[in-house]
Amino acid sequence: MDEMDNVIRSLEQEYRLILLLNHRNKNQHRAASWYGSFNEMKRNCGQIITLFSSRRLQAKRLKDVEWVKLHRLLQRALFRQLKRWYWQFNGVIALGQFVTLGCTLVTLLANVRALYMRLWEINETEFIRCGCLIKNLPRTKAKSVVNDVEELGEIIDEDIGNNVQENELVITSIPKPLTENCKKKKKRKKKNKSAIDGIFG
């Protein structure tokens, strides 16, 4: 649990930096596309911190429902949203106008990802216990058991499927569309153009 507390304290520190960055940039950048990803990261991190702060203040274990919620938040962030967040923040650097802001965002994202992965590893047994993860059992090689009494069938010759001759192939013709049902377009005569039409088009 000591390692868990260290990870939570580090995550709280990163969350404070995220909040400062949010407060500093929300008026100027709130319409930018990367800001939506930043806001998602802020909310996700805030929800995880809220789960753990209640546990630490009351010195209790998390309930199963809270473990499931933590698993859902970590899984969504790590395996679905993280790549999109990275590309959005990297786009800020690529624009060249706010390079320091982009570098700060990518650094925060890297730190948050490392802490999320650490939380995932530490709490893996709890996730398995709650049924969020399936424990990977070592696979044993399945030995094929052949019962001598049971009939396995007859051996099929490989040439059975190749007995089709060219004469047996049937060529089907494509039916032609009926011309009676189709409407015929009437040809219009071109109007005689005058000299003025030739000039003005």
From Swiss-Prot:
Its main location: membrane. GO terms for biological process: maturation of 5.8S rRNA; maturation of 5.8S rRNA from tricistronic rRNA transcript (SSU-rRNA, 5.8S rRNA, LSU-rRNA); nuclear-transcribed mRNA catabolic process, RNase MRP-dependent. The chain crosses the membrane at residues 86-108. One of its GO terms (molecular function) is rRNA primary transcript binding. It is a single-pass membrane protein. It is found in: Membrane; Cytoplasm; Nucleus. It comes from the Eukaryota. Pfam families: RMP1 (PF20945). Keywords: Cytoplasm, Membrane, Nucleus, rRNA processing, Transmembrane, Transmembrane helix. One of its GO terms (cellular component) is membrane. Coiled coil: none annotated. Present with 556 molecules/cell in log phase SD medium. Component of RNase MRP complex which consists of an RNA moiety and at least 10 protein subunits including POP1, POP3, POP4, POP5, POP6, POP7, POP8, RMP1, RPP1 and SNM1, many of which are shared with the RNase P complex. Functions as part of ribonuclease MRP (RNase MRP), which is involved in rRNA processing in mitochondria. This is Ribonuclease MRP protein subunit RMP1. It comes from Saccharomyces cerevisiae (strain ATCC 204508 / S288c) (Baker's yeast).
